[in-house]
């Protein structure tokens, strides 16, 4: 679960647009935040992970509030807010990521399932890695395919169409889910987006083209958008119309425009009279988000969750499962525990209210795993557990 955003504009609004969009998308990941943008022909990247004493988004905002706006010539950029799956919550593991030759910069929402074999293959071709993430592998894979196209055509003078071919070859190698927004250091007037499973929304307005993983990321600045289909590639660049530079886009497929609902997403219950009713009405959408709009559902109808693969041996060694929850989360956990009993081969599956759980409730023999289900983000009794 991550939020991502991108923009190409004919006005100097990139950084403000990215920061405002990430503010609206912060519910998609509190662990880290970052942006990358072209300042003239140079890519500038700034990213932070949250700590126990500092919020990554506030730190990023403060850095750019302290800078003189005249110092930046920002028309194109990408941004990301992270929920850590592959790799620890650190600055270096935060997005955007770049290839080891600094050719490609990307942000990514999703999980690359075959990252281990891809990483080993790229290392054998001389690529290096700074992070523990699956996303850095995609950046290096883009560079690899771009370089191979240069070798095959025996030229260093490659066009932005070669970038698109490199993207096509890259996604053929990937297994999993992804929403990708891509910058190339050779082309400061171009942005690319592609997806498989993870959603990407794209909007073309009078002065800019914007990309977001969900509607709230547009933060009220667009009138309409379309939802990119799986494995289509959106190429975004400038077109000259009557000697005026206009941001434009191209896709292989034809899309129907969707009007944006006019509401203040994060700061008000509008159009509902109060927050409770808004949350009730948004439950179907919340269920879809929990599934990452299908991005966590694999083609064989199994579910892919981030972080499980690294602990799979420990999970398989468990004999007992205990759900701990409070309030409505406790009711949900009661249902989940009954499903676990039916589908899973654990010796025992139990569910406790967090306020009533005691240390003596833990089975005395064999390994026990705990599933803590919070309510509205924070539950004191679960902290106690």
Regions found by a protein language model. Name each.
Residues 1-269, 273-276, 285-317:
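Conserved short alpha-helical segments that host acidic/polar catalytic motifs at enzyme active sites
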């Amino acid at each position: 679960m991550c939020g991502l955003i991108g923009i190409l504009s004919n006005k100097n609004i990139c950084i403000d647009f990215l920061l405002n969009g990430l503010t609206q998308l912060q519910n998609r990941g509190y662990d880290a935040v970052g942006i990358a943008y072209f300042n003239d022909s140079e890519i500038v990247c700034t990213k932070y992970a949250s700590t126990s004493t500092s919020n990554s988004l506030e730190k990023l905002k403060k850095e750019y509030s302290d800078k003189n706006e005249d110092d930046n010539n920002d028309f194109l950029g990408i941004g990301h807010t992270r929920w850590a799956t592959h790799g620890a919550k650190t600055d270096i593991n935060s997005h955007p990521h770049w290839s080891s030759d600094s050719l490609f910069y990307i942000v990514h929402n999703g999980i690359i399932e075959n990252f281990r074999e891809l990483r080993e293959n790229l290392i054998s071709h001389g690529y290096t890695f700074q992070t523990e993430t699956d996303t850095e592998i995609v950046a290096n894979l883009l560079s690899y395919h771009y370089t191979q196209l240069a070798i095959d055509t025996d030229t260093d003078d490659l066009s932005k169409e070669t970038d698109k071919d490199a993207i096509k070859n890259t996604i053929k190698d990937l297994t999993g889910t992804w929403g990708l927004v891509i910058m190339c250091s050779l082309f400061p007037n171009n942005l690319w987006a592609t997806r498989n499973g993870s959603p990407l929304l794209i909007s073309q307005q009078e002065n800019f083209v914007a990309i977001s993983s969900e509607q709230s990321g547009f933060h009220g600045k667009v009138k309409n958008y379309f939802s990119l289909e799986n494995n289509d590639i959106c190429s975004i660049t400038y077109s000259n119309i009557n000697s005026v530079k206009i941001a434009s886009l191209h896709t292989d497929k034809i899309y129907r425009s969707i009007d944006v609902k006019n509401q203040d997403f994060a700061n008000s219950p509008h159009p509902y009279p109060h927050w409770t009713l808004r949350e009730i009405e948004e439950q179907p959408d919340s269920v879809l988000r929990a599934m990452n709009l299908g991005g966590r559902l694999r083609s064989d109808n199994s579910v892919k969750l981030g972080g499980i693969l690294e602990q799979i041996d420990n999970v398989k060694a468990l004999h007992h499962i205990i759900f701990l929850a409070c309030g409505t989360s406790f009711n949900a956990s009661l249902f989940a525990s009954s499903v676990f009993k039916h589908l899973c081969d654990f010796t025992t599956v139990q569910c406790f209210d967090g306020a009533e759980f005691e240390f003596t409730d833990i089975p005395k023999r064999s390994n026990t795993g705990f599933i803590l289900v919070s309510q509205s983000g924070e539950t004191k009794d679960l902290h106690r557990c």
